[in-house]
């Protein structure tokens, strides 16, 4: 029995969990958020300037509700908390901020992780970069924000738990640049961070991610490669794939790009685990980027020129049509040909109920890691190059 459920996807929709449920939630959020459009324009028109401390001390670290890295002492590392949105109890979610302020002036970079709560390798990558920095030898500033979605990280789950409508989960990486007067806590949290912490302190930015629970991805960078400043940075990473795509509105790196700040998204393997080998590649690439911008001195490490980089601008999802156990016939990074069988599925009797093939040639960039699947779940994504990319599509989580 042959099933070829293929639907071309030209945006970063690697992490589908429940299309119907998430789509309904997104529609509700959009409808509710429309009422706040006028207030959103006033709160996000100009990024905040100047550092504001709340007077609180948490675990020995000062708490800020706005940050300007120019106010910090040069030649030091600074550790503080940024005050995010309130919880239902009235307390605030705090976000960890580390700033390495060089002794000499220079460019400012923002490194972000923890936008999704199950993406551990992204956090470790940023921590490793920051641990290697010596402010006494730097020109410029590197600011790391490692746990953007604190409530999601507490449960090591992808989405932000929202209690406003009973039980709901919100993907904050569809909310940027956020709205300080938005319809959900996640939207307000994003607005506070973007307006008062991230945007005011960035000349360029990197938002680190991984695959999601139940769906693994390989090492790649998602970037708008037609932007010269972004292309120059992405090519400094010794990783094997580049997804040259603008993605869609609502993701953090696009919010940066929309206000003139070059940004992109590295993807670092599987969720919930630390892939130290893969992390080292992205640390090396990020250090190359800091050298490229003159923040650090010294020779570059390995770059994309030292590895065989496959560049695609579209991803083909292969979706399950049956429920059952999934057996993959290819691995991440494998090259596939048009018509090649990539997976089969068995029911509870062990009978093969579906076979899945790729309709085009490319490389495997993502695979379902959960052994069982219901109809509609993505089983694999094939990265490929489309001669004429489509534009303007958006896809629910």
Model-identified regions with their sequence ranges:
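Structured catalytic-domain cores with a bias toward divalent-metal coordination
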Residues: 3, 7-22, 38-397
